[in-house]
Amino acid sequence: MVTILDGKAVSEKRLELLKETISESGLYPRLATVIVGSDPASQMYVRMKHRACERVGIGSVGIEIPGDATTQNVLESVTRLNRDTDINGILIQLPLPKRVDTERVIAAVNTEKDVDGFHPTSLGLLMSGRPRFAPCTPKGIMNLLAEYHITVAGARAVVAGRSIDVGRPMAALLTNADATVTICHSRTRDLPAELRQADILVSAVGKAHFITPEMVKPGAVVIDVGINQLNGKLVGDVDFEAVKEVASAITPVPGGVGPMTIATLMENTFAAAAMRMP
């Protein structure tokens, strides 16, 4: 019988543990979120992060910047947050409007406050096997695999998607955990054949029900990072009902990877605060 990897339940457990840890530490970590424009999905995600902060005892401040802002406007806000000694973590809510240079904004974040793990220095440390802050979604996935005692070392892992926020850091974390990793993308030849090699399959392609049973090795662990709309419903990259008949374990959408991402952000923010302890 397939195991449903319940990210919601695992994240609840981790958040409760973090709440206790923060309370016992005597620290008061603070997270600043920066959102540019009024995209409803981005606003919803930011609200969820602030609610999680409140729950575990992390202070939070939201910086809202008009959608017509320039790159320089956003950089000025980031600079102020970098200088604010009361702020431990800075999160830039992505995507930014096209007129804003995302790479410049991310690179402007103080690396000691880069709790999203997207700064070039953070990614470089991750690739070298010495991560300070790993991006929250890939790190959350690794925590979920560990919670269910899924063996990564020696496994053949395939990551579908090569984005800098999920695909590439996911591959790095799996490699650091001694998996044999393949990254697939839009130019991969015979993609189904590559995916069928996976003991652990991570899909981050952003296409509803893209992964079908024919692409999945029987008994594989399937991690669905996708968040897509299909016929008015929220679905993942994986055809869940069909693929669960083939997989040994699978994450649902919603309730799988998403909650783990937020829990990891909270953990990274506390870690950033703890790093500054004398």
Curated annotation (Swiss-Prot):
Native organism is Methanoregula boonei (strain DSM 21154 / JCM 14090 / 6A8)
Q: Which InterPro entries match?
A: Aminoacid_DH-like_N_sf (IPR046346), NAD(P)-bd_dom_sf (IPR036291), THF_DH/CycHdrlase (IPR000672), THF_DH/CycHdrlase_cat_dom (IPR020630), THF_DH/CycHdrlase_CS (IPR020867), THF_DH/CycHdrlase_NAD-bd_dom (IPR020631)
GO cellular component terms listed in the entry, alphabetical order? cytosol
Q: Which family does it belong to?
A: Belongs to the tetrahydrofolate dehydrogenase/cyclohydrolase family.
Write out the entry's keywords from A to Z.
Amino-acid biosynthesis, Histidine biosynthesis, Hydrolase, Methionine biosynthesis, Multifunctional enzyme, NADP, One-carbon metabolism, Oxidoreductase, Purine biosynthesis
E.C. number, please? 1.5.1.5, 3.5.4.9
Protein function = Catalyzes the oxidation of 5,10-methylenetetrahydrofolate to 5,10-methenyltetrahydrofolate and then the hydrolysis of 5,10-methenyltetrahydrofolate to 10-formyltetrahydrofolate.
Positions with a binding annotation for NADP(+) = 161-163, 186, 227
Provide the catalytic activity annotation.
(6R)-5,10-methylene-5,6,7,8-tetrahydrofolate + NADP(+) = (6R)-5,10-methenyltetrahydrofolate + NADPH; (6R)-5,10-methenyltetrahydrofolate + H2O = (6R)-10-formyltetrahydrofolate + H(+)
GO molecular-function terms, A-Z: methenyltetrahydrofolate cyclohydrolase activity; methylenetetrahydrofolate dehydrogenase (NADP+) activity
- Oligomeric state and partners? Homodimer.
Q: In which pathway does it act?
A: One-carbon metabolism; tetrahydrofolate interconversion
Cell wall biogenesis/degradation keyword on record: no
**Entry-linked Pfam families:** THF_DHG_CYH, THF_DHG_CYH_C
Q: Mind telling me what this protein is named?
A: Bifunctional protein FolD
- Report the coiled-coil segments: none
What biological processes does GO assign it?
Answer: L-histidine biosynthetic process; methionine biosynthetic process; purine nucleotide biosynthetic process; tetrahydrofolate interconversion
Which domain of life does the protein's organism represent?
Archaea
